[in-house]
Amino acid sequence: MGPAGSGQLTKMVNQICIAGLVEGLSEGLSFARAAGLDPLAVVDVISKGAAQSWQMDNRYKTMLEGQFEHGFAVEWMRKDLAICFAEAKRNGALLPVTNLDDEFYAEVEKMGGRRWDTSGLFARLEAKRGAL
């Protein structure tokens, strides 16, 4: 990747991207349910286009089933995001959406989801709209 530290910085980029991506997928699935659409049919269509991602391919079913006891824990994501925020403060990068995502992860922790997979963001949305 480059000089010493480049790999760690690249991991930070990855975590920033995943945090936003998982929230987007959560919002999309919650919206589909709220709109009365079949989320499985929706994913079948959108997974063939620009919205497709590893997270969609590997997490949408467990999200819809309310299964969050697997994968990369919310507490670990928040630890990683704290490292990203410290680096952003140092290098002047702006992370407004990532800051918001971190607030959402904090809410998931308050729901008892500290050890849930990061896709637990979906549970936060469903709880807020009274669907859980």
Residues of each region from the PLM?
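Helical "substrate-binding/catalytic lid" subdomain
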Residues: S6-K128
